[in-house]
Amino acid sequence: MNLRPDPTFHPTPRLAMEAPAETLAFTLMLSPDGSQPDGLAVIDVDPTSKSYGDIVHQVIMPEKGDEFHHFGWNACSSALSPLTGHAFLERRYLIIPGIRSSRIYVIDVKEPLKAKIHKIIEPEEVFAKTGYSRPHTIHCGPEGIYVSTLGGGGPDGTDGPPGIFIMDCETFEILGRYEMDRGKQDKHYDFWWNLPRDYMVSSEWGLP
């Protein structure tokens, strides 16, 4: 844990825009036919570098058929909310869900050129603790890591509605479902929030 807020946590969009440009970027590598594992690529995006535009490091996953889609950080500027108690977190881990397998990878990128797998959350744990499947999007929120899902329970993800679950942003344990009352919702897609006004807007799309 840091002794002061992570310098990449910006209280305002303007301060984020004024921050130094990134020199490395992360992108996902997919196996279109599922014959190879998916992976994470670290790309040099420093225009002054001799390796500009090149993949300078890779993390290849141990399983096939995950189908990576979206991914996100364990922590971000929302940790600065005075209601969280997480202001001294470090933006260090990438959370990568497999939308087909329901498996979740936690990648330690503190040293991007030595990025490595920190933890793997197997689909059985996701099913057992949330009743959801097919994790879709990762958002770092004030209370932890929010994960939107496209699938409910059952082998094909259609047994009950999907929704949102929360993971601990330090241990990466699954804490359970976010919703207390979903109303008439029977599908799910993504969401975003207005933290100062304390509300979230979520959307529906389709079942897997």
Label for each model-derived stretch:
Residues 2-5, 16-89, 95-122, 157-159, ...:
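Beta-propeller domains
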Residues 108-195:
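Asp-box/WD-like beta-propeller blade repeats and closely related beta-sheet repeat scaffolds
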